Amino acid sequence: MSPVLSESQLRDFKHTLESSKIPFRSEVRLGILSSFKIGGVCPVIVEPEISSQVSEILHIFSKFDIPWKILGGGSNLLISDHPDNFVTLRLSGKFKEFVSLGDGKFKIGAATNTTPTFRQISQLGYTGAEFLSTIPGWTGGAVIQNAGCYGGELFDLIESVEFLRNGEVFVRKPSEIKYGYRFTEFLNQKDSIILGIEILLKEGNLEEIESSLKDKRDRRNSSQPENKKSAGSVFKNPKVFREDGKEIKAWELLDQAGLRGQIKGGAQISPEHCNFIVNLGTATASDVHYLIDLVVDRVYQTSGILLNREIEFFGDIP
């Protein structure tokens, strides 16, 4: 575990941010920025509004030897109870915007909220992105994980990805990026920051689009714990198939292992949908981590299948 940032280190760092007119906030409880509502207080959260500020912040991080992590919509994260040994970077300003470029092409900022953004784009009469209106979080995070559901993936629609790496802005086509099921090369490149994407959609029938939006919304609502704080599906489907060719789902393995409803502290494996862990109101990151380890061990013992996490850890979680 890394040491807590010193007061003098933070003081000089914040003074430089002020001089550079880069927006930031101090002593922010990160749990309020996550769908899990779990996470402790971070000493500083920096909120750049334009690309040049992002580049400048990375230079400042290096100058003061400040460890940092980037936080998006917080929908697929388990945040540490003690995120006090790093600074959080969270895009704002122009990164929260999307614009039509005409002929079905849209430029979408990394800090746009996926659900309303792709619903609005679909309601303009363009089809192909309806499934993304059911995925919570921000577009940047959706890019990193190649988010998808109902047979669609974000990279099916992407024309280009704009990202910053080592202080330089790049624009890459999907053919120039490694990606797959719930994976892109950005997952393993912590020095890369997604800035935005361009997508291309086809014109469609608005009545059919509205019907598709409603169908996917209803399916999503029926497959998740209702009105519960969670980070979405905890485990990836293992890509293992039965003799009849049907895919074995992660939730089935949890259910067969007798894990439905298991509780640790304020966290519970959902009785309704057991590939979800829910915050009953007082859950800590350690509570959730305990249940994750329990699932991995028990499922392996009962099925011989090793499950991989879909949610990401943010900070040190014992």
Curated annotation (Swiss-Prot):
Active site: R182, S233, E310
Chain intervals with Basic and acidic residues compositional bias: 212-229
GO BP terms: cell division; cell wall organization; peptidoglycan biosynthetic process; regulation of cell shape
UniProt-annotated location(s): Cytoplasm
Ranges for region Disordered: 212-232
Keyword Cell division set for record: yes
Catalysis: reaction(s): UDP-N-acetyl-alpha-D-muramate + NADP(+) = UDP-N-acetyl-3-O-(1-carboxyvinyl)-alpha-D-glucosamine + NADPH + H(+)
Role this protein plays: Cell wall formation.
Domain (FAD-binding PCMH-type): residue spans on this chain: 38-204
Pfam family, one: MurB_C
Gene: murB
Source organism (scientific name): Leptospira interrogans serogroup Icterohaemorrhagiae serovar copenhageni (strain Fiocruz L1-130)
Cofactors (names): FAD
Documented EC number(s): 1.3.1.98
Family: Belongs to the MurB family.
Gene Ontology CC: one annotated term: cytosol
Protein name: UDP-N-acetylenolpyruvoylglucosamine reductase
UniProt keyword list: Cell cycle, Cell division, Cell shape, Cell wall biogenesis/degradation, Cytoplasm, FAD, Flavoprotein, NADP, Oxidoreductase, Peptidoglycan synthesis
Gene Ontology MF terms: FAD binding; UDP-N-acetylmuramate dehydrogenase activity
Principal location: cytoplasm
Pathways per UniProt: Cell wall biogenesis; peptidoglycan biosynthesis
